[in-house]
């Protein structure tokens, strides 16, 4: 009840007392009761109107607000229903019991927000990490690294898998394994996070930015054909927001031009293309386990391939280029791109419930689709939701909605409305071609 100390007063109390209470609680409102029974909510705005009218604030609240109706909800009301009632006008709602006694209150700030992604750490994460700490295996050597790699490849039917320190280092490692260097060109989509293009630049090669397909937001196979040159060495296809690229067409381009295909699956763990998990189509594929990804290790990544030579080279490069049979003897100029045993312990625990996490994301997306479909025609004609494809099972890393017309004002209004309702939203990635540092790689 301490939280209600500066919020509740009786209808017999003066308006001046209510004003003092509102100034003290900083919430812009207070709750009015009659013999402990909830009556109404009055705001600083209500009192301001009385001041303008030069009313006597020493009179009781009952004199002015006896007929004012206030919103109150039962203490057991689900949060989603409370969110629906909160707005710019109704910023605070008292929560009452069956006898209309005030027990608590809700505001947008004290309700749990609906985040873009909430990490599920309710499995064996704590137990496995504790095991690492108890046994002192906290660096890049330890049983959990191999256990995580094995669990990952078996679940998604990958032949070979190698943990890395991040999704970005996995991409850079892939380019190094394929011997991509200065003078080579690597094709990359225009709409993506910067990791792929940065990895290409760090490899010394030239990125070639290619436009996207308007329906999927993934790299457009027809546009790739226009950008292929004698110097093209590889394509990095990014399965954006959980939607798979047109892999059938990409594989045709790869075969015809004798180039490599790297799948960036950072946002598409669990996505399927023609019955197979993405990551099974490229020469090398990479994943990210950053904190907002479908499964997480805090920071971390994975490189997968079916090519034993690529795998062996990646493993050496990942550990400083050191000969695995002759310690401290370096065969290659390598990197420290290893994942720690601690991170892998979290990853293993995450993989134990990967199926549940993926299914839940798809269920939530289906719910969004169902509810959006019920909107009136005028609204639906202004937006584009993720496009269904019979060949693809979208894992919906992030559910996305695009406004058809270029209307930044409407976009910002929607984001602001979501924020008021306690729902976290964000804009799409910026096109690479719009950023000064990458502009020269786009025609």
Mark where each language-model region is.
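Phosphate-binding glycine-rich loop
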Residues: 143-185, 199-203, 209-211, 276
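N-terminal "arm"/small-domain region of PLP-dependent enzymes with the aminotransferase-like
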Residues: 108-136
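The conserved cystathionine-beta-synthase
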Residues: 7-27, 33-34, 51, 71-91, ...
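PLP-dependent aminotransferase class I/II
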Residues: 148-150, 159, 222, 226, ...
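Active-site phosphate-binding strand-loop segment of PLP-dependent enzymes
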Residues: 215-297, 302-304, 308-309, 410
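Short hydrophobic beta-strand motif reused across regulatory alpha/beta modules
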Residues: 40-45, 103-109
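Bateman (tandem CBS) regulatory domains
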Residues: 1-7, 13-14, 57-70, 132
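Generic structural signal for small/hydrophobic residues in well-ordered secondary structure
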Residues: 129, 152, 170, 186, ...
């Amino acid at each position: 009840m301490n939280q209600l100390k500066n919020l509740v007063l009786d209808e017999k109390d003066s308006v001046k007392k209510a004003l003092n209470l509102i100034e003290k609680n900083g919430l812009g409102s207070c709750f009015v009761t009659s013999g402990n029974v909830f009556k109404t909510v009055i705001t600083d705005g209500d009192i301001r109107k009385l001041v303008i009218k030069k009313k006597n604030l020493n009179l009781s609240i009952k004199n002015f607000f006896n007929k004012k109706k206030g919103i109150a909800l039962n203490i057991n009301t689900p949060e989603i229903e409370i969110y629906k009632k909160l707005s710019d006008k109704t910023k605070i709602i008292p929560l009452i019991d069956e006898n209309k006694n005030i027990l608590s209150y809700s505001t947008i700030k004290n309700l749990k927000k609906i985040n873009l992604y909430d990490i599920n750490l309710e499995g064996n994460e704590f137990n496995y990490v504790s095991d690492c700490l108890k046994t002192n295996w906290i660096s890049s050597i330890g049983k959990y690294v191999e256990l995580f790699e094995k669990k990952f490849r078996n679940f998604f039917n990958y032949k070979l898998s190698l943990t890395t320190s991040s999704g970005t280092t996995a991409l850079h490692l892939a380019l190094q394994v394929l011997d991509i260097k200065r003078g080579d060109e690597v094709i990359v989509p225009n709409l993506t996070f910067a990791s792929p293009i940065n990895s290409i630049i760090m490899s010394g090669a030239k990125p070639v930015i290619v436009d996207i397909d308007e329906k999927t937001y993934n790299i457009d196979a027809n546009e790739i054909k226009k950008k292929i040159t004698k110097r093209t060495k590889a394509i990095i296809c990014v399965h954006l927001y959980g939607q798979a690229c047109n892999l059938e067409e990409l594989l045709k381009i790869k075969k015809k031009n004798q180039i490599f295909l790297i799948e960036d699956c950072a946002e598409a763990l669990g996505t399927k293309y023609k019955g197979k998990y993405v990551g099974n189509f490229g020469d090398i594929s990479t994943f990210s386990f950053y904190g907002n990804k479908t499964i997480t290790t805090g920071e971390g990544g994975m490189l997968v391939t079916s090519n034993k030579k690529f795998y062996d080279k990646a493993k050496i490069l990942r550990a400083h280029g050191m000969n695995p049979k002759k310690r401290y003897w370096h065969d290659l100029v390598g990197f420290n791109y290893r994942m720690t045993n601690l991170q892998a312990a979290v990853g293993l625990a995450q993989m134990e419930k990967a199926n549940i996490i993926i299914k839940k994301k798809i269920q939530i997306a289906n719910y969004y689709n169902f509810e959006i479909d019920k909107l009136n025609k005028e609204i639906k004609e202004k937006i584009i939701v993720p496009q269904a494809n019979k060949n693809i099972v979208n894992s919906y890393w992030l559910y996305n909605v695009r406004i058809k017309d270029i209307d930044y004002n409407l976009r910002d209004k929607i984001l602001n409305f979501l924020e008021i309702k306690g729902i976290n939203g964000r804009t799409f990635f910026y096109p690479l071609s719009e950023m000064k540092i990458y502009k020269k790689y786009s025609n």
